[in-house]
Amino acid sequence: MSRTGIMIDEKDEGGNTDLMRAALDGQTETVEALLRSGADVNARNGEGRTALMFAVVNLHTSTVRTLLQFGADVNVQATCGCTPLMLAAGNGDIVITRALLDSGADPRTICRPGKTALIVARERGYRAIVELLKRALAEATQGKPKSLRSNVQGHARTDALAVTK
């Protein structure tokens, strides 16, 4: 409940909050006002999706940045296993992809069908995002056991070859 007594995180029949609907529409000022009033930045709907996911999938860069500033979980997974990073990579949005990575999104996360953000970007032919994610994977694997590092880096090289074919 907000300071004014309004149920700020009340959900509609689909499980969506006002924050989610504002993020979906790219209403950055409304998103910020709701967050300042105490809206839960990481509230989930019935499919496990968050306001950040709605902003990402609809390419609302300024809304994404606002949600990140208010602590949105960049590694949250919806019921299907998808993450905001996978959604950004699948949409071909390098600016949002980079913002998510800069905020700590893990490029190693695998969704239910067994795909990473890198695989999604590769399948859709987004070469610049593939290169960005390959670099992020290399950084993410530093300090891991050599066997894991080799497997992940080998995966990235395989993906790079597939993109160039």
Question: What are these language model-derived features?
Answer:
Residues 2, 23, 35-36, 56, ...:
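Ankyrin-repeat helical core positions
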